[in-house]
C-alpha cells in the first residue's frame, strides 16, 4: 500500500497520516537481571525500519514513557535507520508532572535531555504535556510563573523547537 500524507497548513510539513507512538514498546527479560524487563531494542529497531518502509515519518514520544526510556530508544532506532534527520518528524513532550520538576532549571534540563536522548539538535513538535492536570493553577506553576514557557519560546525562535503546542487530558471544566 501507499502512505497518505497531509501537508501542515502553517509550516508545510508533509506528515504521514499514521504516526508511530513510542509509549509502549516490545520488552524482554534483562540478561543482567532476570527479574527485570527492559526494552527489546533490536525488535524496536526492526519495527522502526518497517514503519519507514511503509511511509511513516512521524514519531511521538515523551520523557515519561517506558519508565523514562522511550526517548532514548527512539533516538537509537532513528539513528540506526540511517535516515536523514529531515526525512522524519519527532514529537516529544515536556512532561514535568511532579512539583519537583516545576523549576525553570528542571524544565530546561528535561528539554536538553530530550535533545540528547533523541540524538538531535531540534524537536519538530514539542508539547506541554497534559496541561489539564491540576487545572490552571498547576499550568501556571509548571510553565508560566517559572518563566519556562518564555524560555521555550526563545528556543523556538532559535530553531531548537520547530512547533510548540500542548496536549490536554481532562474535561472542559
Predicted segments with their positions:
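Structural motif corresponding to the early beta-alpha repeats
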Residues: 81-104, 129-132
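N-terminal binding-site loop/beta-alpha segment at the start of enzyme catalytic domains
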Residues: 1-88, 150-151, 157
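Residue-level signal for alpha-helical context at structural boundaries
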Residues: 77, 91-92, 144, 170
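Active-site beta-loop-alpha junctions enriched in small/polar residues
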Residues: 23-25, 62-64, 93-97, 128-131, ...
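Glycine/proline-rich, positively charged
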Residues: 29-31, 36, 101-173
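Compositionally biased, intrinsically disordered low-complexity regions enriched in proline and serine
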Residues: 6, 21, 90, 123-126, ...
Amino acid at each position: 500500500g501507499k502512505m497518505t500524507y497531509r501537508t501542515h497548513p502553517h509550516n508545510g510539513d508533509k506528515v504521514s497520516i499514521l504516526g508511530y507512538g513510542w509509549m509502549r514498546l516490545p520488552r524482554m527479560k534483562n540478561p543482567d537481571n532476570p527479574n527485570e524487563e527492559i526494552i527489546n531494542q533490536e525488535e524496536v529497531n526492526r519495527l522502526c525500519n518497517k514503519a519507514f518502509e511503509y511511509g511513516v515519518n512521524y514519531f511521538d514520544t515523551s520523557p515519561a514513557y517506558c519508565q523514562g526510556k522511550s526517548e532514548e530508544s527512539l533516538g537509537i532506532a532513528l539513528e540506526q535507520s540511517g535516515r536523514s534527520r529531515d526525512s522524519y518528524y519527532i514529537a516529544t513532550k515536556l512532561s514535568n508532572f511532579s512539583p519537583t520538576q516545576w523549576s525553570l532549571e528542571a524544565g530546561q534540563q528535561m528539554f536538553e535531555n530530550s535533545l540528547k536522548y533523541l540524538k538531535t539538535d531540534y524537536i519538530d513538535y514539542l508539547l506541554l504535556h497534559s496541561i489539564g492536570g491540576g487545572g490552571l493553577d498547576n499550568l501556571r506553576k509548571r510553565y508560566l510563573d517559572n518563566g519556562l514557557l518564555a524560555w521555550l519560546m526563545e528556543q523556538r525562535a532559535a530553531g531548537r523547537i520547530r512547533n510548540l503546542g500542548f496536549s490536554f487530558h481532562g474535561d472542559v471544566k
